[in-house]
């Protein structure tokens, strides 16, 4: 049996009486309805872990967190789509060029688990009627790499790259102007970047909270962090703050020859939302969410863009 639950007026009383958060009037009632109690209000009250509840005095502070989260996702969503598509297309283009021995099937044969994953991904999309997959099956043609990449997740794409031969991985990162002899000796740079982006990509696409990086569930490569700090000149990157993901996205967009105007527009958009958050919530909460050096990192990012 499904219980009815509280009315919005009842929820507002509960928020006032139990949480000590001041919420009143039709405007705040509509805002609560728009964000939702569990997905919006409750998820905005804590930072990183549900045990780390913040003592906000009024509903506007909670709403400022929620609004910041939505705005950052609005900025990040097209960037993540563009970067994922571009990386896949560049690998497809690279595969098509006759450079050295690039038989990716030979490398994938070593990884039975990945081969099984590829087969199950293709079978799943065939059963769901994906037109591209069905076309090649019904034509009795082998499935080209671009068609497989069209239906893969970001994580599967990272696994695909990880199964390539080391010389092949290095060659591809060189082709993208991302190889560094000090930080990419094992050719793992690109897969580390992809695995780093997978959590935020999935959280953004599924409209989960990203403002405090609660989607982080893996250790990030120290090689990647050192490389990013070395390339951008920005220190103390640890991916505990959403600002660090902005740095990685700008770095990748710059490697993909995005104009300085566009890069500056993205950073400026983010910085306006950061400043608004700064002026809307207690300093303790702001520092926990974005760290104490967010403004410094943003300035470093602007400098990195102008130097390129």
Give the ranges of each region predicted by the language model.
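Extended intrinsically disordered or low-complexity regions, especially N/C-terminal cytosolic tails and loops
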Residues: 1-199, 211-308
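Acidic/aromatic/glycine-rich contiguous surface patches that form carbohydrate-binding/processing clefts
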Residues: 207
């Amino acid at each position: 049996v499904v219980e009815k639950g509280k009315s919005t007026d009842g929820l507002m009383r509960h928020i006032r009486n139990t949480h000590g958060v001041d919420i009143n009037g039709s405007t705040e009632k509509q805002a609560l309805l728009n964000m939702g109690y569990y997905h919006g209000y409750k998820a905005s009250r804590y930072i990183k872990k549900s045990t780390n509840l913040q003592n906000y005095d009024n509903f506007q502070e909670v709403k400022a967190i929620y609004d910041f989260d939505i705005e950052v996702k609005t900025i990040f969503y097209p960037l993540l789509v563009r970067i994922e598509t571009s990386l896949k297309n560049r690998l497809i283009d690279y595969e098509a060029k006759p450079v050295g021995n690039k038989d990716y099937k030979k490398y994938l044969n070593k990884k039975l688990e990945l081969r099984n994953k590829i087969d199950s991904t293709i079978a799943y999309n065939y059963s769901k009627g994906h037109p591209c997959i069905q076309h090649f099956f019904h034509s009795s043609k082998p499935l080209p790499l671009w068609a497989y990449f069209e239906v893969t997740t970001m994580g599967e794409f990272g696994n695909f790259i990880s199964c390539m031969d080391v010389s092949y991985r290095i060659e591809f990162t060189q082709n993208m102007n991302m190889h560094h002899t000090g930080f990419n000796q094992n050719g793992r740079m690109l897969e580390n970047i992809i695995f780093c982006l997978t959590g935020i990509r999935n959280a953004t696409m599924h409209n989960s909270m990203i403002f405090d990086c609660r989607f982080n569930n893996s250790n990030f490569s120290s090689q990647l962090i050192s490389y990013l700090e070395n390339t951008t000149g920005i220190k103390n990157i640890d991916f505990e703050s959403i600002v660090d993901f902005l740095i990685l996205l700008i770095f990748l967009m710059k490697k993909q020859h995005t104009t300085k105007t566009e890069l500056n527009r993205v950073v400026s958009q983010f910085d306006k939302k950061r400043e608004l958050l700064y002026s809307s919530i207690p300093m303790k909460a702001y520092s926990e969410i974005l760290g104490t050096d967010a403004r410094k990192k943003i300035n470093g990012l602007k400098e990195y863009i102008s130097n390129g």
